[in-house]
């Protein structure tokens, strides 16, 4: 009798556990395998767990990492072959400790930079302390990397270490050569085996920044005014940036808010932009700076992307940049600066994607970069990646929750 009672208890416990299992079926409608692609579901999907901690497992029973985002989504990586389905399970349990892949922070010690990264690439944008110096840096910057672990924080700490900076300053008085050698040994502008910062932004749109267009002139944004980090790993970094008022068609109180997120495994940030107090529909452009005259770019409004290969550096290789648009854009083209503007901006022009911003709406697109020393040996490989990324946006993974 005791044995039967024990079996009944076990069966009851198993049934209760099964009642709390959430099955997530992912379907890949595209002709491309999707590997470790971050998928999201609403937190309502786990309501039956009644607040219990949970684990997510794949079809082999192995745990997969997940993150609960600021906007109450559960995100996790999925792998599913073209045209197939795969099922993941969510159930009560204690999740394993997973490595942080996507992360970032503000660096007040480096004129308020906000910098972020994942396992593929890193970026930064500029803050109010830089704007106060008068230096012109409008667009998004790229930091290339060739290691999967986070390295941006270490680069800043090494470059800006007060003791090292003081030693360099002293050496400059007595031994300029030694001072230079020490400065180079800690500089993030030199590759010490994990990548570097050698992309130039200046007074341009840099690596895929957007701006309003008035009478064919770009109303360049400057540095952010306020920032708020909304997500900080392990799988997604999200930052909200609010900018100083712009003057647009006589209105001097147009305020841009920019939300940027970067997921693990992706070369591309997601940008969501709004303009408050804008009175009427206004052209908006997303641009990639052309540092030199070049034909090594693609601009395809029909397929919804622009992509560009920056001039190759003989030591550091080549940086590739792109922007991809889930909604239809009006035009995609290269625009060359006038001679005067070339001199002012230190560049040849932009590859631009042109759209229209309607007041009260949001403008969403993806922009990012790759490096010839970390996965993209030539521009052809980069353009292939961008084309597939654009196509995958049109054929998103579908999610069924049971």
Regions found by a protein language model. Give the residues of each.
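Beta-strand-rich recognition/accessory modules
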Residues: 73-80, 327-402
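Solvent-exposed beta-strand/loop surfaces of large extracellular or lumenal domains
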Residues: 51-74, 247-251, 292-307, 332-343
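Bacterial Sec-dependent N-terminal signal peptides
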Residues: 1-25
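Polysaccharide-binding surfaces and accessory modules of carbohydrate-active proteins
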Residues: 19-22, 283-336
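Short, hydrophobic/aromatic-enriched beta-strand segments in well-ordered soluble domains
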Residues: 84-95, 239-243, 286, 322-323, ...
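Solvent-exposed N-terminal domain segments of exported/luminal and surface proteins
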Residues: 89, 94-216
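Alpha-mannosidase-like glycoside hydrolase catalytic domains involved in N-glycan trimming
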Residues: 19-105, 110-111, 136-139, 144-145, ...
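Acidic, contiguous internal or C-terminal segments within carbohydrate-active enzymes
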Residues: 225, 229-231, 238-284
């Amino acid at each position: 009798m005791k044995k039967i009672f024990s079996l009944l208890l076990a069966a009851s416990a198993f049934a209760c556990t099964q009642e709390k299992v959430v099955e997530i079926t992912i379907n890949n409608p595209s002709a491309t395998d999707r590997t470790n692609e971050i998928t999201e579901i609403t937190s309502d999907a786990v309501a039956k767990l009644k607040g219990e901690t949970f684990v997510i497992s794949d079809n082999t029973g192995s745990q997969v990492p997940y993150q609960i985002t600021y906007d109450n989504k559960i995100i996790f990586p999925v792998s599913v072959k073209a045209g197939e389905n795969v099922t993941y399970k969510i159930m009560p349990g204690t999740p394993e400790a997973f490595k942080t892949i996507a992360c970032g922070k503000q660096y007040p010690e480096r004129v308020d930079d906000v910098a972020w990264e994942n396992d593929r690439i890193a970026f930064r944008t500029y803050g109010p302390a830089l704007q106060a110096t008068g230096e012109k840096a409008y667009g998004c910057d790229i930091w290339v990397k060739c290691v999967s672990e986070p390295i941006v924080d270490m680069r800043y700490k090494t470059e800006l270490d007060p003791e090292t900076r003081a030693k360099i300053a002293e050496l400059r008085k007595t031994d300029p050569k030694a001072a230079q050698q020490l400065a180079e040994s800690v500089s993030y502008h030199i590759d010490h085996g994990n990548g570097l910062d050698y992309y130039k932004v200046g007074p341009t749109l840099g690596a895929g920044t957007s701006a309003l267009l008035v009478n064919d002139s770009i109303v360049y944004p400057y540095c952010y005014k306020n920032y708020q980090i909304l997500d900080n790993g392990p799988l997604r970094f999200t930052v909200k940036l609010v900018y100083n008022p712009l003057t647009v068609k006589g209105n001097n109180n147009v305020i841009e808010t920019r939300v940027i997120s970067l997921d693990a495994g992706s070369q591309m940030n997601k940008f969501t932009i709004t303009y408050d107090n804008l009175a009427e529909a206004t052209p908006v452009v997303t641009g990639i700076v052309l540092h030199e005259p070049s034909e090594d770019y693609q601009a395809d409004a029909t397929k919804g992307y622009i992509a560009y290969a920056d001039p190759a550096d003989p030591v550091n290789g080549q940086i590739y940049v792109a922007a991809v648009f889930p909604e239809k854009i009006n035009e995609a083209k290269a625009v060359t600066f006038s001679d005067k503007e070339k001199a002012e901006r230190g560049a040849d022009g932009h590859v631009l994607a042109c759209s229209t911003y309607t007041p009260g709406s949001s403008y969403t697109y993806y922009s990012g970069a790759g490096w010839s020393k970390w996965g993209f040996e030539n521009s052809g490989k980069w353009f292939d990646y961008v084309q597939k990324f654009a196509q995958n946006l049109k054929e998103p993974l579908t999610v069924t929750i049971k």
